Each structure stands twice: as C-alpha cells, then as structure tokens.
Amino acid sequence: TRTDDKPGVNRNMEMQQQQGGFIGHRPRLASFNRASKQLDREKRPVPSGPDPIHHSIPSHAPQHPPSYGKAPYEDDKSIASPGLSNLIGPPPFLDRY
C-alpha cells in the first residue's frame, strides 16, 4: 500500500503541474489588454459626452432638494419662534392685569 501511496502523490504533483500550465495560458489576458487599449480610444469619447450631461443633471437635482428643504425649515422656525413668543407673552400680561 505504501508504494501505492507514492504514485498517488506523484499524480497530485502532476495535477499541480497542470495548474502551472493553466497559469501559463494567463498571458492570453495580456493580448486582451491590447484589445482593451483599442476600446479605450473609443471609450474615451463616449464618457466625455455623457460626463458633462451627467454632471449637469446631478448638480441641478441636488441643488433643488436642499433649497426646498431649507425653505420649509426656515419657515417652520420663523413660525415657531413667533408662536412661542406670543404664547409666552400673553401669560405675563394676564398676570399684570
């Protein structure tokens, strides 16, 4: 059985070697990179177009919501301030009377 075990280990080693071969195939990715470079040339103009539009859209969208939110908040504060002061004001007057 021991001798049998030894061959099994050898088989494992062979499998590992195969994996190494697979890594050797990896260089194919390098060739893909070259193709990607060509695509980059086409890609550059594409993003440049949508980029400005996309920028203007987000800039407008965020600006509107904040201003809207601020307006109501300020109104609430101004209303709350006078309301509280009015409520506090009457009691002293009544007391004086």
UniProtKB/Swiss-Prot annotation:
Residues 1-97 are annotated as: Disordered. One of its GO terms (molecular function) is receptor serine/threonine kinase binding. It comes from Zea mays (Maize). GO terms for cellular component: apoplast. Glycans are attached at P50. This is CLAVATA3/ESR (CLE)-related protein ESR2-C. Keywords: Developmental protein, Differentiation, Glycoprotein, Hydroxylation, Secreted. One of its GO terms (biological process) is cell-cell signaling involved in cell fate commitment. The lineage of its organism: Eukaryota, Viridiplantae, Streptophyta, Embryophyta, Tracheophyta. Belongs to the CLV3/ESR signal peptide family.
